Design a protein with these regions (language model features):
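Short, structured beta-strand/loop micro-motifs enriched in basic residues and often containing a Trp
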Residues: 36-47, 93-102
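Short, conserved beta-turn/loop elements at beta-strand boundaries and strand-helix junctions
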Residues: 63-64, 71-76
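Short, charged beta-turn/beta-strand-edge "cap" motif at the junction between a beta-strand
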Residues: 32, 47, 63-66, 120-123
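Short conserved beta-strand and strand-loop elements enriched in small hydrophobics
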Residues: 54-62, 116-119
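Helix-rich interaction surfaces within compact, conserved domain-sized segments
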Residues: 26, 90-123
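Short, solvent-exposed secondary-structure boundary/capping segments
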Residues: 74-85
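Short, well-ordered loop/turn sites that connect or cap secondary structure elements
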Residues: 47-53, 58-59, 110
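N-terminal, charge-rich interaction modules
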Residues: 1-23
Length: 123
């Protein structure tokens, strides 16, 4: 597998886990505006080394998820802002332009130090 993007969660906003009950995980790079940081999983921004597209694999810690849909601006948001909204709903069409949909259950063990990755499953 080829790693397209990798980063490490450094801290978790006070209200970030609230979105998990709605099957969402919202990330933003370090240095996010304070009013956004409260709702985000903050990470040290990595380099995006390829396109975000359906067919990738997303992983968070030991959890692995297929990516069936990617919104039209999700790649730009990740590259420029370190921001992405992940939806754990398995939809095959992106509901919103900034959303990446993954198939599988919402992880319940996200903590600072958790590694987040997008990988190509084709060599």
């Amino acid at each position: 597998m080829t790693v397209i993007y990798q980063t490490t969660i450094t801290r978790i906003g006070a209200s970030a886990t609230d979105a998990l009950s709605d099957q969402m995980l919202i990330t933003f790079r370090e240095g996010a505006p304070a009013d956004l940081e409260e709702y985000c999983f903050i990470h040290c921004h990595g380099e995006l080394k390829g396109a975000l597209h359906p067919g990738l694999q997303f992983s968070l810690g030991q959890h692995r998820y297929p990516v069936p849909a990617v919104g039209s601006v999700a790649e730009d948001n990740l590259r420029e802002l370190g921001h992405v909204t992940l939806r754990f709903d398995g939809l095959s069409e992106a509901e919103f332009p900034g959303t990446v949909h993954v198939a599988g259950p919402v992880p319940d063990d996200i903590a600072p130090g958790s590694v987040l990755k997008f990988e190509s499953v084709k060599e």
